[in-house]
Amino acid sequence: MARKQNRNSKELGLVPLTDDTSHAGPPGPGRALLECDHLRSGVPGGRRRKDWSCSLLVASLAGAFGSSFLYGYNLSVVNAPTPYIKAFYNESWERRHGRPIDPDTLTLLWSVTVSIFAIGGLVGTLIVKMIGKVLGRKHTLLANNGFAISAALLMACSLQAGAFEMLIVGRFIMGIDGGVALSVLPMYLSEISPKEIRGSLGQVTAIFICIGVFTGQLLGLPELLGKESTWPYLFGVIVVPAVVQLLSLPFLPDSPRYLLLEKHNEARAVKAFQTFLGKADVSQEVEEVLAESRVQRSIRLVSVLELLRAPYVRWQVVTVIVTMACYQLCGLNAIWFYTNSIFGKAGIPPAKIPYVTLSTGGIETLAAVFSGLVIEHLGRRPLLIGGFGLMGLFFGTLTITLTLQDHAPWVPYLSIVGILAIIASFCSGPGGIPFILTGEFFQQSQRPAAFIIAGTVNWLSNFAVGLLFPFIQKSLDTYCFLVFATICITGAIYLYFVLPETKNRTYAEISQAFSKRNKAYPPEEKIDSAVTDGKINGRP
């Protein structure tokens, strides 16, 4: 195998080099990113960290700011200006028809405005494979900014144009942007990162979702943009992250795995590895991908139906479906329904509640950052299983405190603690790890179809919660949280028995971990079992 590795390395023109990266790439912005390698922190013993590079940081931050940040922002941005938007709907209707809008019609229009974001997300998920096959990961993210910018302009100009339809259409287009972003960004980050930091880099998606939610809450304050005269600007600022991504990502290469396995462009793949890893000698990394490339070269991208039928990924698919369903059905969205009433019962003046609500966004962000810092130490399993388990426990506690909140003045404060604990539990694991696992469970040819399945479950579950929760809440009142507690506990139990730890494992090793449960082996393992089996058996 060593002789084989050397032959492949020479074929690619790779020779052992020193740490000097001055000749690793052409001059220009890309080289500047590579040369900032000296900013990375050192490790004991004088050894330098090889995991993080400035290019990885720029790719993750710029990618997430223009993608998952916008998803989180659009989840919360409609809350503060709700009364002003409804008034705008009524004024537009009265100007056209000569009479005020019927309350039921207004409720329907507002429900469509909120829920159509999820419909757009589903559409975006379904077109990912088609766009990604042609454009690749990076250029799909860049093209996706066209959806964000057009949606921002439509929504920001709706008041001036007197057309509420522009706001609804803009929300739909913004949903398409979110559907594409939540599929392509985790794929891109998973494929450009070394396995040692794949989880931490993947959590950037969740961190920026939380930052986006918090930013939407913050800008919605009356002192900022949450006023009747300025609410359209809440949607106009969506342009800023999109433009930042458009100006930064072009200087970075596409996923090296995509370039090598799907485009078969070895030279560009080598340069991409050099840029993202911040070193010139990437022969080992290229050889790891070539091991997959030797069998993947003749394998086309599988379809969603083929992936669902494949016995050798059956439990990976089931696990992705379970985690994504629990991600949306775990009840976090329902928490926002009770937040204002609970804060009010705790004695907080109504005018101050929007400011106190910022604490929920702050807790989300801190918990997501904590998860990103510890995920490579604790692993995926403890954070995901523990997160769902704690959510189930705190939902049960919240049900008790909400039932007894009129019996003592201090009980509502326990409810506030319960809400914050649920949010922290969600963001410390379930809020981001499902996206990471979807990227880790599948080989290159399967990954786009896997993200279509995951995204479809995600957006359909999102839509179902928005549609069904009002009826569940009306029927069960505060006991509705017991439904979410059951979902969380059930998900935790399933993951405890099925989910293997993927921390610091290659894609081949993760596939092997599922093989016994699947009772079937993927074709590449049969063809090149010496590669994968050798690595598995070599693990301590």
UniProtKB/Swiss-Prot annotation:
Changing R171C: In RHUC2; uncertain significance; according to PubMed:21810765 the variant results in markedly reduced urate uptake, however according to PubMed:29967582 urate transport activity is not affected; no effect on Vmax; no effect on Km for urate; decreased protein expression; no effect on glucose transport. Changing L332V: Increased fructose binding affinity and decreased fructose transport capacity. One of its GO terms (molecular function) is transmembrane transporter activity. InterPro entries: GLUT, MFS_dom, MFS_sugar_transport-like, MFS_trans_sf, Sugar/inositol_transpt, Sugar_transporter_CS. Glycans are attached at N90. The chain crosses the membrane at residues 52-72, 108-128, 141-161, 172-192, 201-221, 232-252, 317-337, 355-375, 382-402, 416-436, 452-472, 479-499. It catalyses: urate(out) = urate(in). Residues 73-107, 162-171, 222-231, 338-354, 403-415, 473-478 are extracellular. Changing N333S: In RHUC2; decreased urate uptake; increased Km for urate; no effect on protein expression; no effect on glucose transport. PANTHER family: SOLUTE CARRIER FAMILY 2, SOLUTE CARRIER FAMILY 2, FACILITATED GLUCOSE TRANSPORTER MEMBER 9. This is Solute carrier family 2, facilitated glucose transporter member 9. It comes from Homo sapiens (Human). The gene is SLC2A9.
